[in-house]
């Protein structure tokens, strides 16, 4: 939904996903959309991919960090390696991406960094020990980026989604839920676009 929204609004969109297959459908459906296979948890791969994006599409005006890693379970159950991977995807990737995009945004005195998250960024819950800390760190990192880059023209915002997103697997998980129980991906995309341009 995010890719479709920004493409419809006239942006050339670079999409990043671990697997190429997830990107191909959107590339064939939309114009001015280019997919790049990359594991955002790998900083070397991410920097190389960002170089490709800049050479093919130019310097980004808006970054939406929507990747998510999760290791669910109690603090006694979670695998520390999977927890570290979730931290790399959720928090470290944001750090690396911000370092890559903000220099040109600051030079232009225009740009936006939007990060999607959820209420796990604000509170811990049972069985979220491998996820909530990574989202809290992500939110606090973005707040720090906002304080530092904001006065230089870069708008940074954390979009906390306190709802169940309407996806095939969530429909399956909540079979008896009514339509208005779910948050529509298009509504999230519209809000992210609005925030990026406020």
Segment roles from a protein language model:
Residues 11-23:
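Conserved glycine-rich Rossmann-like NAD(P)H-binding loop of the short-chain dehydrogenase/reductase
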Residues 21, 37-48, 80:
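The beta1-alpha1 cofactor-binding region of Rossmann-like NAD(H)/NADP(H)-dependent oxidoreductases
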Residues 66-72:
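Conserved NAD(P)H cofactor-binding loop of Rossmann-fold oxidoreductase domains
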Residues 74-75, 82-87:
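Substrate-binding pocket helix/loop in short-chain dehydrogenase/reductase
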Residues 151-164, 174-198:
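C-terminal helical subdomain
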């Amino acid at each position: 939904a995010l890719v479709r929204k920004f493409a419809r609004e006239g942006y050339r969109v670079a999409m990043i996903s671990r697997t190429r297959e997830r990107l191909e459908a959107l590339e064939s459906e939309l114009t001015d959309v280019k997919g790049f296979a990359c594991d955002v948890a790998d900083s070397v791969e991410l920097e190389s991919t960002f170089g490709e994006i800049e050479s093919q599409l130019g310097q980004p005006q808006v970054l939406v960090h929507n990747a998510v890693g999760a290791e669910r379970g109690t603090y006694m159950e979670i695998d520390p390696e999977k927890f570290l991977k979730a931290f790399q995807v959720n928090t470290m990737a944001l750090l690396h991406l911000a370092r890559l995009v903000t220099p040109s945004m600051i030079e232009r005195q225009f740009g936006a960094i939007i990060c999607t998250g959820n209420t796990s960024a604000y509170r811990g819950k049972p069985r979220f020990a491998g996820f909530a800390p990574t989202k809290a760190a992500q939110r606090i990192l973005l707040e720090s980026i906002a304080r530092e880059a904001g006065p230089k023209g870069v708008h940074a915002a954390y979009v906390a989604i306190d709802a169940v997103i309407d996806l095939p697997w969530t429909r399956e998980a909540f079979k008896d839920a009514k339509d208005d129980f779910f948050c529509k991906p298009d509504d999230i995309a519209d809000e992210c676009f609005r925030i990026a341009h406020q």
